Each structure stands twice: as structure tokens, then as C-alpha cells.
């Protein structure tokens, strides 16, 4: 026994060193440990993900103190050993840290479980809930939040950090096939969330198409991403809120979380894709909360250069019409979304004198390098100005025509958050969560 003590001491020290290294979760981000050879089809009535397929996936569970049970409500993405990224609307009704538990490394979860989790799962408490300062509970604007984990989670074979976009990467290309994951409902009116983690392939959808008359009719803002299919059938649903929308450039690239599951009309309906909070618009905010160094560790080392052929948000010149020109629709829909004016590009076939460009004298020829640099600066300046103008118009419209709270409307409402409400276990199916 005396001879074994040094060996035991060495083993204990080695384990402690490995645990210390893993606790930081500073390893490569966005890497999958396992993946399904069938490449999952959908979350709604679809394919289950394998254990370790999405190691940054987190289950946010509501904790009931009287019976110590935990009920899955939202998803989230692990940033590092201290922070989880999720949606702000998950905390509309449960704002206290002691109302929540976090489960990492899970493929299966038990709804209403009152026993400790088993390996490789890890359960943690929430130390702090950080909701975006400009989050709007009615319009769902700035639907993003961070959770401080306590004690820090340990990364390993089934738990690892996600990647976030690089500052220089810009919006992903369209068309682009991405993935969504979650434990949400597998159909629109399911009795409770899925017990197994589901994965789905979805296509990014151009924001102008998503905002067209037959789709969301301008209710998607410039800080959102639309993903799904025109015919529906594959989509996120209640209980998937806060979970990631993930894309990668090629099979050798890490997955990057480009969106946070936010809202939608129903689940898997035609021309009603899922709407996600665009993460690249909130990188500065995330860095201000978790620290710039922590953000840098989860950004890909070689960002993909932004594209101008298929931009995520199509650029349109600012309209010459004043902000008050854009009025609300005559009949307000029963589901509430922020209204964004659709700024249309004048057609190239139009020959009206009011649209003809003014003639200007020719300018002297410039070197090629100077011309390219000037065009790049003008494009960035114009795009920035257009986005600021668009957001100003949205803000003015909200002040001039304040949106009513959903409770002030009568009749059926088919707008749903992707948040799963919890109810005590019973044989009676629960209805999808309706904000009121």
C-alpha cells in the first residue's frame, strides 16, 4: 500500500491538471465529435442527433423548488466554461436565476426529472441573466441574452464551445445550407418537448423574400435571419427558442452560430420560416459582456470574406420618401411582429425623367488600386448609412404607431415564440405557448 501512494498521487495530479485545462474550454470551437451519417432531416417530425454531435448544445430547464423537478423550456449555445448564449424572450416570465438549471452534454433529457443527471451530462446553476438592454418584449427586437454559469462547466468528449462569426466575416452567403438543433416540439401542437435532441438541415432565405407580401410582409427586422424552406415541412418549433442556427463554409470548416432561434408563425408552415436573431449584429454587445479576449477565442481564425453576389441582407438605396410615407397595413394581423418598410430598388427598365441620373463631367482616370479602394469604402459607407436609416425608420414608426400588447387583440392568434412552457406531468396535452 505504501508503494502505491506515489502512483495514486501522480494520477490524482494528472486528473486535476486535465480537469483544469478542460474547464477553460479554450480548445477549438465549432467541432463535432460525432455526426449522423443520415444527416438529419428535420426537428418537426424528424431525425435525432447522436450523442456528441452538437457539443455546445445546452438545455435550459425551469426548476420547481417544491418538488425539485426540471422542465426543458429553451435551448442555448455554450460559448466557454462561463457563458451560454440564448434568447431573451425565454425569461419573460422566469427572470430569477434560481428558477433555472442548465444541462450540458445531453442527447436525451427527461421532462420533469427530479434526479441528478448521469455522465456525460453536467448540470449547472445560473449565476447571472444578462438580457439585451434594448430587448422589446412586444416586438421581439434584440432577442438575445447571456447566462453566467456557476460553477464553470468542464469541456470534454461531449461538451465543447461553439463558434461565433468573425467581425470581418459578414453575413453568410445565400444560398447556404445550415443546421438547427433542439429539444422542441416535433409538431406544432405536441403535448411536450422532444425527449431526444433533434437536428435539421435548413436553407438561409433572403431577407427581402422573407419580408415579401405573401411571407412575413415586412415584419422581420434587419437584425434577423430567416431559415427554412418555402414549402415549410422542416422548421424549429416551441422549445427550440434560444438554440443555434449553425452554418459552415465547407466540410473542413467549423460550424459557426449565425442565428438564435427566436420566433415564427406556427411550425413548419409554408412561407412561414423560422426567424432567428443574427449574431453578427451583436458581436460588440457579446464582447462587452464576456470580454473581447473570450470572444476572440471562439471566432474562426480564418474568416470567410464577405460576398456581394448573394448578400444575406440585400442592399437597396435609401428611399426619397419621408418616414411618415410608410403607413401600417389597413388590417393588422393577429400575430405581432415589428414592421419594416420594404425599400425597393428602381427598375432598370424605368425611363422616367425623375429617375434618370444626373449627368456629370468625366473625372480623370485613377490608378486601379485607388479605384478599388474607393469603391470598397463607398460600398461600406453606403451600406452602413442605409442600415442606420432603415433602423431609424423602424424606430420612428414604433413611436408614431405604437404596437399593442397581444392581450388587447381578440380572436385566435397563430404567432408563437419558440419557447416551451412547462406544466406538471399529466395525461392532458398542453397547448403551445402563447404570449399574452
Swiss-Prot record:
InterPro entries for this protein: Pept_S1A_acrosin, Peptidase_S1_PA, Peptidase_S1_PA_chymotrypsin, Peptidase_S1A, Trypsin_dom, TRYPSIN_HIS, TRYPSIN_SER
Residue positions the entry lists as glycosylated: 22, 211
Single Gene Ontology MF annotation: peptidase activity
EC annotation from Swiss-Prot or TrEMBL: 3.4.21.10
Catalysis performed (reactions): Preferential cleavage: Arg-|-Xaa, Lys-|-Xaa
Signal peptide bounds: 1-19
Keyword flag Glycoprotein: yes
Means of activity regulation: Inhibited by SERPINA5.
Record key words, sorted: Disulfide bond, Glycoprotein, Hydrolase, Protease, Serine protease, Signal, Zymogen
Pro-peptide positions on chain: 346-436
A Gene Ontology biological process term: activation of adenylate cyclase activity
Cystine connections: 25-155, 29-163, 74-90, 178-247, 210-226, 237-267
Ranges of residues in domain Peptidase S1: 43-291
Active site: 89, 143, 241
GO annotations of cellular component type: acrosomal matrix; acrosomal vesicle; Golgi-associated vesicle; protein-containing complex
Highest taxon above the source species: Eukaryota
Pfam families: Trypsin
PANTHER family cross-referenced by the UniProt entry: ACROSIN, ACROSIN-RELATED
Quaternary structure, from the entry: Heavy chain (catalytic) and a light chain linked by two disulfide bonds. Forms a heterodimer with SERPINA5.
Function: Acrosin is the major protease of mammalian spermatozoa. It is a serine protease of trypsin-like cleavage specificity, it is synthesized in a zymogen form, proacrosin and stored in the acrosome.
Family membership: Belongs to the peptidase S1 family.
Designated name of the protein: Acrosin
Name of the encoding gene: Acr
Amino acid at each position: 500500500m505504501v508503494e502505491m501512494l506515489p502512483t495514486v498521487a501522480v494520477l490524482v495530479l494528472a486528473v486535476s491538471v486535465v480537469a483544469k485545462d478542460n474547464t477553460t474550454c479554450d480548445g477549438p470551437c465549432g467541432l463535432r465529435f460525432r455526426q449522423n451519417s443520415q444527416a438529419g432531416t428535420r426537428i418537426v417530425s424528424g431525425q435525432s442527433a447522436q450523442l456528441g454531435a452538437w457539443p455546445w448544445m445546452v438545455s435550459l430547464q425551469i426548476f420547481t423548488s417544491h418538488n425539485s423537478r426540471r422542465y426543458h423550456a429553451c435551448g442555448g449555445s455554450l460559448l466557454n466554461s462561463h457563458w451560454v448564449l440564448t434568447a431573451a424572450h425565454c425569461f419573460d416570465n422566469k427572470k430569477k436565476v434560481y428558477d433555472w438549471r442548465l444541462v450540458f452534454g445531453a442527447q436525451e433529457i427527461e421532462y420533469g426529472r427530479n434526479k441528478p443527471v448521469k455522465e456525460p451530462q453536467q448540470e449547472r446553476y445560473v449565476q447571472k441573466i444578462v438580457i439585451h438592454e434594448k430587448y422589446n418584449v412586444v416586438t421581439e427586437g434584440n432577442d438575445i441574452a447571456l447566462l453566467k454559469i456557476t460553477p464553470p462547466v468542464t469541456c470534454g468528449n461531449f461538451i465543447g464551445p461553439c463558434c461565433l462569426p468573425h467581425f470581418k466575416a459578414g453575413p453568410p452567403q445565400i444560398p447556404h445550407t445550415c443546421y438547427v438543433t433542439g429539444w422542441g416540439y416535433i409538431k406544432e401542437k405536441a403535448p411536450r418537448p422532444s425527449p431526444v435532441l433533434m437536428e435539421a438541415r435548413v436553407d438561409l432565405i433572403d431577407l427581402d423574400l422573407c419580408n415579401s407580401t405573401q411571407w412575413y410582409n415586412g415584419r422581420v427586422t434587419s437584425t434577423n435571419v430567416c431559415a427554412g424552406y418555402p414549402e415549410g415541412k422542416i422548421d424549429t418549433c416551441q422549445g427550440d427558442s434560444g438554440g443555434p442556427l449553425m452554418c459552415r463554409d465547407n466540410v473542413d470548416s467549423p460550424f459557426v452560430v449565425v442565428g438564435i432561434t427566436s420566433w415564427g408563425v406556427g411550425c413548419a408552415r409554408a412561407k412561414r420560416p423560422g426567424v432567428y436573431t443574427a449574431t453578427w449584429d451583436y458581436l460588440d454587445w457579446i464582447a462587452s459582456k464576456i470580454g473581447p479576449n473570450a470572444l476572440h477565442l471562439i471566432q474562426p481564425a480564418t474568416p470567410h470574406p464577405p460576398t456581394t453576389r448573394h448578400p444575406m441582407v440585400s442592399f437597396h438605396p435609401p428611399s426619397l420618401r419621408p418616414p411618415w410615407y410608410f403607413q401600417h397595413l389597413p388590417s393588422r394581423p393577429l400575430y405581432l411582429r415589428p414592421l419594416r418598410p420594404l425599400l425597393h430598388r428602381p427598375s432598370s427598365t424605368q425611363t422616367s425623367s425623375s429617375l434618370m441620373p444626373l449627368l456629370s463631367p468625366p473625372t480623370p482616370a485613377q490608378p486601379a488600386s485607388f479605384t478599388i479602394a474607393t469603391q470598397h469604402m463607398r460600398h461600406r459607407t453606403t451600406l452602413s448609412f442605409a442600415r442606420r436609416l432603415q433602423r431609424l425608420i423602424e424606430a420612428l414608426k414604433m413611436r408614431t404607431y405604437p404596437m399593442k400588447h397581444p392581450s388587447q387583440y381578440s380572436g385566435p392568434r397563430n404567432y408563437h415564440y419558440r419557447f416551451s412552457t412547462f406544466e406538471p406531468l399529466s395525461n392532458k396535452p398542453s397547448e403551445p405557448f402563447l404570449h399574452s
